[in-house]
């Protein structure tokens, strides 16, 4: 059986562990920048310098990382490529 894939958690966790700066756009049009320090099912903690923002996920419209985020490991990607060749 295939492993369950949670895109949101994987994306946020990569941003958190890699400390990739992000821009977060809220549904009211407000924009904030920072590094994701932590997140749970309902909130995420964004840090910018010595300022912290606890943002409720239901208020988030878009998260834009400053660099590309690869959601699959190179091993997984190589496995896919070899499957496609067969």
UniProtKB/Swiss-Prot annotation:
Pfam families cross-referenced by the UniProt entry: Hfq (PF17209)
Keyword RNA-binding (UniProt): yes
InterPro entries referenced in this protein's UniProt entry, alphabetically: Hfq (IPR005001), LSM_dom_sf (IPR010920), Sm (IPR047575)
GO BP annotations listed: regulation of DNA-templated transcription; regulation of RNA stability; regulation of translation, ncRNA-mediated
Location of the Sm domain: 9-69
GO MF annotation list: RNA binding
A cellular component term, taken from the record's GO annotations: cytosol
SUPFAM superfamilies associated with the record: Sm-like ribonucleoproteins
CDD domains: Hfq (cd01716)
Keywords for this protein: RNA-binding, Stress response
Keyword RNA-binding in record: yes
Role noted for this protein: RNA chaperone that binds small regulatory RNA (sRNAs) and mRNAs to facilitate mRNA translational regulation in response to envelope stress, environmental stress and changes in metabolite concentrations. Also binds with high specificity to tRNAs.
Classification via PANTHER family: RNA-BINDING PROTEIN HFQ (PTHR34772:SF1)
Subunit and partners: Homohexamer.
NCBIfam families reported for this sequence: Hfq (TIGR02383), PRK00395.1 (NF001602)
Family assignment from sequence similarity: Belongs to the Hfq family.
Protein name: RNA-binding protein Hfq
